[in-house]
Amino acid sequence: MTAATLVTLALSLSLAQHDAAPAPAPAAVEQHGAAPEAAASADPHAAPAGEHGAAVEAHAAAAGEHGEAAGHEGGHDESLGAVMLHHVTDGYVIEHPGFCNGAFAWNCEWDLRATFGDALKFGKLDLTPTKHVIMMWLASALLLVVVLAAVRKKSLVPRGLYNFIELLVAFVRNEIAVKNIGEKDADRFTPYLVTAFFFILFLNLFGLLPFSATATANLSVTVAMALFTFFITQYAAIRAMGMGGYVAHLTGGVPKSLAPLWLIMVPVEFLGLFTKPFALTVRLFANMLAGHFVILALLGLIFALGTPWVAFGSVPMALSIFLLELFVAFVQAYIFTMLSSLFIGAGLVHHGDDHGHAEEHGHAGPGMGSEHGSHVAGASPGHG
């Protein structure tokens, strides 16, 4: 029961009591000897009752308007919060401009569930794509188009957009992969790093376009991408060190003579394996989500305060944050790619470290300490 209904009932009861109070009025008329008037006393009192009924309706209408106004004002902040959440959360409806209901509108809706129906439902497993999945499909398609067009270019000297794309590819290879992984192994992991860089970049840029969505503000998307880096990192480490060396690395380099410390080092090293993908996940997700919330909050000041004059301050501020988000789109793609290359390179570097530890601690016989020490010292630059 709404507040407007309660107010209407209260007014009706009070007015009903007020109607019952002036009952002696006909007797007063009869005492004055106005018989003809007494005969017609029902009609004059019917008119006040009608007036009271009109008053009740007026009060009810006023109460209803008051309730609606209060509900509108109370739900204004909720509607602003709902708009903000709707902008960043995933769903099955994509808004777009177009012709719907026989006329052009800016808020036409594409219901993905209605489009795909039950074609992608397998029991309790629902594979119907959401709007973030659609954005990832578009980013993948754009990535294929750009790469294939750049590969098939006829001119040896790239121009325009292809020059910019080639510049970014060379930057990822030379400044990220080579410096963090090494010249020897960089080319093996450059394709993944380039793909991750452009995929994240396109998703970030799509989120700045009207009627689109920011898939990188979805925790599930960033978790999946961080897991790709995690599995590639573990694969690189196992391939470089072997399974035995990989497991031995979990001891943190503590020698067998201090084996009791393994009870501390092994859990710490094991947890350290998962802190890296966690950092990748939260960093990308939080940065992209926060930027959109700030823009929407600044624009929402116009509606929250109820005056258009706020637009002179909030719109320029929102535009400034938008330009900053354009820069952040490139920065977050770079940071994710750089951290991924650092983690991969760390797994490869551990191979040289463990090899040095094995030579120092595992195979030196009695009387060979000084000779072996000089051998390791002389070989260490080669390992670097």
Curated annotation (Swiss-Prot):
Domain of life, per lineage: Bacteria
Gene Ontology MF terms: proton-transporting ATP synthase activity, rotational mechanism
Membrane topology: Multi-pass membrane protein
Basic and acidic residues: bias regions: 65-76
Primary localization: membrane
Disordered: region residues: 23-76, 355-384
Keywords attached to this entry: ATP synthesis, Cell inner membrane, Cell membrane, CF(0), Hydrogen ion transport, Ion transport, Membrane, Transmembrane, Transmembrane helix, Transport
InterPro entries named among the record's database cross-references: ATP_synth_F0_asu, ATP_synth_F0_asu_AS, ATP_synth_F0_asu_bact/mt, F0_ATP_A_sf
Gene3D superfamilies per the UniProt record, alphabetical: ATP synthase, F0 complex, subunit A (1.20.120.220)
Subcellular location: Cell inner membrane
Record-linked SUPFAM superfamilies: F1F0 ATP synthase subunit A
GO CC field: plasma membrane; proton-transporting ATP synthase complex
Residue ranges with Low complexity bias: 23-64
Annotated TM spans: 131-151, 193-213, 218-238, 258-278, 293-313, 319-339
UniProt xrefs under Pfam families: ATP-synt_A
Family listed: Belongs to the ATPase A chain family.
Known function: Key component of the proton channel; it plays a direct role in the translocation of protons across the membrane.
Oligomeric form and interacting partners: F-type ATPases have 2 components, CF(1) - the catalytic core - and CF(0) - the membrane proton channel. CF(1) has five subunits: alpha(3), beta(3), gamma(1), delta(1), epsilon(1). CF(0) has three main subunits: a(1), b(2) and c(9-12). The alpha and beta chains form an alternating ring which encloses part of the gamma chain. CF(1) is attached to CF(0) by a central stalk formed by the gamma and epsilon chains, while a peripheral stalk is formed by the delta and b chains.
Record's protein name: ATP synthase subunit a
Biological source species: Anaeromyxobacter sp. (strain K)
UniProt gene name: atpB
